[in-house]
Amino acid sequence: MMSGEHTLKAVRGSFIDVTRTIDNPEEIASALRFIEDGLLLIKQGKVEWFGEWENGKHQIPDTIRVRDYRGKLIVPGFVDTHIHYPQSEMVGAYGEQLLEWLNKHTFPTERRYEDLEYAREMSAFFIKQLLRNGTTTALVFGTVHPQSVDALFEAASHINMRMIAGKVMMDRNAPDYLLDTAESSYHQSKELIERWHKNGRLLYAITPRFAPTSSPEQMAMAQRLKEEYPDTWVHTHLCENKDEIAWVKSLYPDHDGYLDVYHQYGLTGKNCVFAHCVHLEEKEWDRLSETKSSIAFCPTSNLYLGSGLFNLKKAWQKKVKVGMGTDIGAGTTFNMLQTLNEAYKVLQLQGYRLSAYEAFYLATLGGAKSLGLDDLIGNFLPGKEADFVVMEPTATPLQQLRYDNSVSLVDKLFVMMTLGDDRSIYRTYVDGRLVYERN
């Protein structure tokens, strides 16, 4: 495993970050920090010093070459709080809503990950896609096959990437070729936790796909894992689609709704992340808030599968932590800028105006907070892990034109969010090292 070199590194350019986590969007502007000519000093993969170039340049030894990115914009690495790596090859599958889509497209694709060599090949592709889109941390679904998770963690470990992932637990209501059992899912997950959790920057998430595909016996095994390894994460889906919710209620009639299934099995709380949450009942909003659970907002996926519109305003009101998720492969892009672009539209339809600052927060420090990692990543505070992206605000002729006609910082950020894509990502750094550069 590689880690950041011991020698000092110096990066110069324009920087933007949010210096503290917040409880309502009105606070973001006061927490935002923009340094037009800044200096980032990195040592052993961590932020050693950050501030104005003039205040820090005397700290740079003569032997150190400064990486000069003036004219670009340097931001903390993007955080993707919900994505399926074994669905990369089926992005853009036509014409279905959630339950039909799973059976027709997802399950046959995930079957291929039984082959370790195939899983390794796709893990390498997946991580390259994350990096070329500026994503440096992700919460990731594997498949039911433990080797799918081994392959992903192996690939992430080569660049010492901050990643949380887990093996899908699924013992019913899916094709026989993809089912495990309550017992086997427990033992396989336990082995993966022992092998990978807190190995370098890797972390493990207990990952029941969603309540309909886990029997009560398997949910009890997920609970047992969480009790035995309380510092692991939990990653699953919740209230994405109305038919799904009705199905859960029919399968678990003794529970008080969908979220209550997870709650009664001890799968709510800090570091428990629920993707989608488009159709929550009031009591479910309250429970997510009370338990300090988190939501992954996945706009491109919710639009693509016709699932519905996520209510971000309500999440702020209820003080529920939210991060952004691309949700590849129901989501249609690895790119966080495009994901924020779609989030803006989802919220416009509800009369809520997502500012560029708020969007930027959700994709960086807010996402880190939703994953319980805000003490490690998300901004440029000294001691934080040095994951960051050098962005090109004028990557296309249209972006150049629009940038030239933008006056304020918030306007320039908003233009990047609406017109930007993978061409906007000039360089990506993980653990203080360059891991992607645009040709």
Swiss-Prot record:
This is Guanine deaminase. Substrate binds at H84, Y85, P86, Q87, R209, F210, H237, L238, C239, E240, D327. Its cofactor is Zn(2+). It comes from the Bacteria. Catalyzes the hydrolytic deamination of guanine, producing xanthine and ammonia. One of its GO terms (biological process) is guanine metabolic process. Zn(2+) binds at H82, H84, H237, D327. It holds the Pfam family Amidohydro_1. The keyword Ribosomal protein does not apply. PANTHER family: GUANINE DEAMINASE (PTHR11271:SF6). Its EC number is 3.5.4.3.
